[in-house]
Amino acid sequence: KPRFAEIDEIAELNQTKVIAAMQKNRVNATHFAASTGYGYDDEGRDNLERVYASAFHTEAALVRPQITCGTHALAIALSANLLPGDEMLAISGKPYDTLEEVIGLRESPCSLKEYGVSYAQVDLREDGSFDFPAIERALNDKTKLIHIQRSKGYCPRPTISVDAIGEA
């Protein structure tokens, strides 16, 4: 198939998935009405989150215009899932530079480190694969979250495949 035909096919499948999620959650005109802005009883916002959860096959979704970038979304997710005394283990090497302050690799007020969350890291092997023996050695009772950065970001390595993440 020509590349543009593949892209069109993917776009159509995604559109069908979103329409099905909207139908499942019975989106109607009332969901587009203005709200008080206080966030209480905002059925439109709540239903939008159900649509996202349905479309992406997740338990729940948090969809807010106040989440301004990927780092902001990751900071929220990390803060929500880690408590003082917990450890975050990165198994694909050092995360994006923008997460360094969130984690506390660079000093920053309100970082996970300042909150009492520790950080450990296992680098990828030279061939870009996960180092499973090193990961097993790094796991401990405090490890509560394993971070995998699929994107290569600014690192000279290939993007980690979904299959490789599934194996991890």
What does each model-found stretch correspond to?
Residues D97-A120, A138:
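Flexible glycine-/small-residue-enriched beta->alpha junction loops
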Residues S92-D97, K152:
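Acidic, glycine-rich active-site loops and adjacent beta-strand->loop/helix elements
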Residues A61-E87, P95-R106:
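Conserved beta-loop-alpha segment that forms the PLP phosphate-binding cup at the N-terminus of a helix
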Residues K1-T58:
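Glycine-rich phosphate-binding segment of PLP-dependent enzymes
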Residues E59-V63, D86-L89, S118-A120, K144-L145:
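Structural motif
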Residues R26-A33, S111-A120, H147-K152:
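Gly-rich Lys/Arg/Thr-decorated short loops/hinges at beta-loop-alpha junctions or inter-strand turns
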Residues E126-A168:
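Active-site phosphate-binding strand-loop segment of PLP-dependent enzymes
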